[in-house]
Design a protein with these regions (language model features):
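Glyoxalase I/VOC metalloenzyme domain signal
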Residues: 1-6, 11-31, 43, 50-282
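Conserved catalytic-core motifs of GNAT/GCN5-like acyltransferases
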Residues: 32-39
Length: 282
């Protein structure tokens, strides 16, 4: 199966910030719809669904760690969460998985087989409950290293249309005319560039469309890309002082910016939210 279909991009904000985050993204011209609380009760989300059927997951922890009793299982689970130490902003991105939890056709088996080493951990079940009570289930395939810049995979057990409600069509229409994802721009240090390029190529199952010693680009697919331009995954080393400061301020490789294709008379240029950079591509 293909392992290069973009599913969603994760944007983290401070604990309990649902109303503030929703307001910020609506002010950017996005249509934000309710998501729900995840199965572990630690995180909740809202969604921005695009016409290419990729979505932004606006996620936050429901409580800060100190809200849980010291040494309690929930406190430990909160402190050990893969995103617990991540600063707010664009923190992760997911490709579409196949929903296989056990057996020989797991995403982890496919990628680890390509790599001839263990890049991905064993699959784990996931899910959340929507505000309307609908229970969603999926399977997560995640990189073995918690601070990896490699994508995780989300494979639906229940119907994806329940997780990503693209109907009614108004869910994917945005006042800013955003149509789909143009690019995800990853920044790494020069020392990490070559090894990261190799690992991403292994995950995608293809070499970059273009590559220099400072930048590589891969074309991704989406579930509704027939009438839309495809997104690009960009891996690069810092090209200016602002990008160098960004790399220096993050302990692990990170998403620098997300680009959006804009329709006619749509937004242009770039904007920085309180926690992430957005670029409009016409």
């Amino acid at each position: 199966m293909t392992t290069s279909t973009l599913d969603h991009i994760v944007h983290l904000t401070p604990p309990g910030s649902v109303e503030e985050t929703t307001k910020q993204f609506r002010e950017l011209g996005f249509n934000v719809i309710p998501g729900g609380t995840h199965a572990d009760g630690l995180t909740a989300n809202a969604l921005v669904i695009l016409a290419d059927h990729v979505y932004l997951e606006l996620i936050w922890f429901t409580q800060p760690p100190e809200a849980y009793p010291p040494s309690s299982p929930t406190r430990r689970q909160r402190e050990q969460h893969k995103w617990a130490a991540r600063p707010p902003g664009w923190i992760d991105y997911a490709f579409l998985g196949n929903g296989v939890l056990e057996g020989t056709n797991r995403i982890s088996d496919i990628i680890n087989g390509r790599a001839a080493t263990r890049l991905y951990a064993d699959e784990v079940p996931g899910g959340r409950t929507r505000p309307d009570g609908e229970v969603l289930k999926w399977v997560i395939s995640a990189p073995l290293k918690a601070d990896s810049i490699l994508p995780f995979f989300c494979g639906d057990v229940t119907d994806r249309r329940l997780r990503v409600p693209t109907e009614p069509s108004s869910n994917t229409h945005h006042p800013n005319s955003a149509l789909g994802i143009a690019h995800i721009h990853l920044l790494v240090s020069a020392a990490a560039f070559t090894s990261t390029l190799k690992e991403i190529s292994t995950v995608l199952g293809s070499q970059p469309l273009s590559s220099t010693d400072q930048e590589a680009k891969w074309q991704l697919s989406t579930l509704n890309g027939n009438q839309l331009r495809p997104p690009t995954l960009v891996l690069a080393t810092p090209a200016d002082e602002a990008q160098a400061q960004f790399v220096d301020s993050h302990s692990a490789p990170h998403i620098y910016e997300v680009g959006f294709y804009a329709g006619e008379n749509g937004k242009e240029g770039s904007v920085t939210t309180p926690f992430g950079r957005v670029v409009w591509v016409v």
